[in-house]
Amino acid sequence: MELVLKGQNFLEAGNFEDALGYFEQALLLNQNDPELWNFKAVSLRSLGRYEEALECFNKSLEIDPRDKHAS
């Protein structure tokens, strides 16, 4: 998915606000992908928005309890 790739590129470059925007757009299209919730959580955590990040990690675990990235 192009939105996810752009988000990952921004995340890797340290541009967390832009990364977050792309992951939020991707989630509008697919809210059942635990990886997207993890990417959003990492972006939020990097921005110091820890409570929101925790909510996203928890959402990822709700979708896939075996998700090693969110646990």
Short names for language-model regions:
Residues 12-13, 46:
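Register position in tetratricopeptide repeats
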Residues 25-28, 58-62:
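Conserved structural position within tetratricopeptide repeats
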